[in-house]
């Protein structure tokens, strides 16, 4: 038993340590960007509208400025709002902001592997390898263009089979876009009714729905506790295991027929690199292969299909815009050949429409979180190593000095007085800096080729009055989603 004197010393020492830690944290807070005062554990939860986090952040930026601090639960986040702050951080101080921020909902699946690697240098090598491999398999080149056009052909046949009946096009778009990345990752496409393919799309959809749900948002804030509690997150854990098992089996199939001298797809290329780098600390191992492949599937399925889904709705709401795109397709491409990606250089109006669809949709306004990789000073504020940063890409898309009347859908945002395509510095749908979207060139090609191929063959028809179309995405937590709708594809 401790005597009273010794016990008193222990208590005083403990209190002193607690005081010093509190003092140190207070000094850090004083040097951090300003922001609303957080409550213990729940942070700024009560000050955020969890149904529309982007609007809450916009309101906070009006009070605290373009650089401020919020707490999502116990997690401290530095927010960058507006073009100047985002560019200064991600371009001018790119190295300091090059870490990958935490996405707890998707970490359920990726577990810190693949593109979620916490080791910055290993993450860079995986990323460089992936970009090089995507290029090897034709991303940005004619090889992948042929793949996209092949899928577009299957989609056209499917839509022709609807005979103009009203349908919800979302599942058709998901199948088409997913098959493009499937061809790169697996080396083959799936039949649209393949049960394994449909199961894969369903699981990806379940993950995305969970991430956007109220439970998913709470998990992002309080994952350290919620991962042990009953609830929808436990079902998602089962879904992630099925996804992992699916990919492990695909890797096993590839490995059994691997020719080191002739890689057929992304998985083959990674397996060959694994054989070349067998040292203990190499980042080229099975976990990173499985999770990098899954990461490509997620990135390559959702964004483009959702953008097209909203694009169809916007073109029906604005038939004058659709008519001008049809006219440009007729004049530049005609009806006797398939569109080619090089056509976009001669089709400024169509490209402006695609850009404006992306800008107006603004489906992931909060962007991908970054992480400070070393103690950094930014605009006079101290950002400690390990701080997560939200560069609000959506704020760039609505900045009035770049996009006057930004609440309106207007392709003129991207056209000059002569009707030619003009660059807009704030149009950064794929982000910027060292963590920009590695599939941006593939996405640009898909958007142009799929939209022009569809409009070369069909006119869009809404089954009700145009006034009934709600063209604005609905805010759901950290994201925005497109209202479900039906439409008819009328053959030309």
Curated annotation (Swiss-Prot):
It catalyses: an organic molecule + reduced [NADPH--hemoprotein reductase] + O2 = an alcohol + oxidized [NADPH--hemoprotein reductase] + H2O + H(+). InterPro entries: Cyt_P450, Cyt_P450_CS, Cyt_P450_E_grp-I, Cyt_P450_E_grp-I_CYP2A-like, Cyt_P450_sf, Cytochrome_P450_fam2. PANTHER family: CYTOCHROME P450 508A4-RELATED, CYTOCHROME P450-RELATED. Heme binds at residue 437. Its cofactor is heme. The keyword Ubl conjugation does not apply. Gene3D superfamilies: Cytochrome P450. Highly active in the 15-alpha-hydroxylation of testosterone. This is Cytochrome P450 2A2. It holds the Pfam family p450. Its EC number is 1.14.14.1. GO terms for cellular component: cytoplasm; endoplasmic reticulum membrane; intracellular membrane-bounded organelle. Liver specific. It is an enzyme of class 1 (oxidoreductase). GO terms for molecular function: arachidonate epoxygenase activity; heme binding; iron ion binding; oxidoreductase activity, acting on paired donors, with incorporation or reduction of molecular oxygen, reduced flavin or flavoprotein as one donor, and incorporation of one atom of oxygen; steroid hydroxylase activity. CDD domains: CYP2A. Belongs to the cytochrome P450 family. Keywords: Endoplasmic reticulum, Heme, Iron, Membrane, Metal-binding, Microsome, Monooxygenase, Oxidoreductase. It is found in: Endoplasmic reticulum membrane; Microsome membrane. GO terms for biological process: coumarin metabolic process; epoxygenase P450 pathway; xenobiotic metabolic process. It is a peripheral membrane protein.
């Amino acid at each position: 038993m401790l005597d009273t004197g010794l016990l008193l010393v222990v208590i005083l020492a403990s209190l002193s340590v607690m005081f010093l830690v509190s003092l140190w944290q207070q000094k850090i807070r004083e040097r951090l960007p300003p922001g609303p005062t957080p409550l213990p554990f729940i942070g700024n939860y009560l000050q955020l509208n969890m149904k529309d986090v982007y609007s809450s952040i916009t309101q906070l930026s009006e009070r605290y400025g373009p650089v401020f601090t919020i707490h999502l639960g116990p997690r401290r986040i530095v927010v960058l709002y507006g073009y100047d702050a985002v560019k200064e951080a991600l371009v001018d101080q790119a190295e300091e902001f090059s870490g990958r921020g935490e996405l707890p909902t998707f970490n359920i699946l990726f577990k810190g592997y693949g593109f979620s690697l916490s080791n910055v240098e290993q993450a860079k090598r995986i990323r460089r390898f992936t970009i090089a491999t995507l290029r090897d398999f034709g991303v940005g080149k004619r090889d992948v263009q042929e793949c996209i056009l092949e899928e577009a052909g299957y989609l056209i046949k499917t839509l022709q089979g609807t005979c103009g009946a009203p349908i919800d096009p979302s599942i058709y778009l998901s199948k088409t876009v997913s098959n493009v990345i499937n061809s790169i990752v697996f080396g083959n496409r799936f039949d649209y009714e393949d049960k394994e393919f449909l199961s894969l799309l369903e699981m990806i959809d379940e993950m995305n729905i969970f991430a956007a749900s109220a439970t998913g948002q709470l998990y992002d804030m309080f994952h350290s506790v919620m991962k042990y509690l009953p609830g929808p997150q436990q079902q998602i854990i089962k879904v992630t295991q099925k996804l992992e098992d699916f990919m492990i089996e695909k890797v096993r199939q590839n490995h059994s027929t691997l020719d080191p001298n002739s890689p057929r797809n992304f998985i083959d290329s990674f397996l060959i690199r694994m054989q070349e780098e067998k040292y203990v600390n190499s980042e080229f191992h099975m976990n990173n292969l499985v999770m990098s492949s899954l990461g490509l599937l997620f990135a390559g399925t959702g964004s483009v299909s959702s953008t097209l889904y909203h694009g169809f709705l916007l073109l029906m709401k604005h038939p004058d815009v659709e008519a001008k795109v049809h006219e440009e397709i007729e004049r530049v491409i005609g009806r006797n050949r398939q569109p080619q990606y090089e056509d976009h250089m001669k089709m400024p109006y169509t490209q402006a429409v695609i850009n404006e669809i992306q800008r107006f949709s603004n489906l992931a306004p909060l962007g991908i979180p970054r992480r400070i990789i070393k103690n950094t000073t930014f605009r006079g504020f101290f950002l400690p190593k390990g701080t997560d940063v939200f560069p609000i890409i959506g704020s760039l898309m609505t900045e009035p000095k770049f996009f006057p009347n930004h609440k309106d859908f207007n392709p003129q945002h991207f056209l000059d007085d002569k009707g030619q395509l003009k660059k807009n510095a704030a149009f950064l749908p794929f982000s910027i800096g060292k963590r920009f979207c590695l599939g941006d060139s593939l996405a640009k090609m898909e958007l142009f080729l799929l939209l022009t191929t569809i409009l070369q063959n069909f006119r869009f028809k809404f089954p009700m009055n145009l006034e009934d179309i709600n063209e604005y995405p609905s805010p759901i937590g950290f994201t925005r989603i497109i209202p479900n709708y039906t439409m008819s594809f009328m053959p030309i």
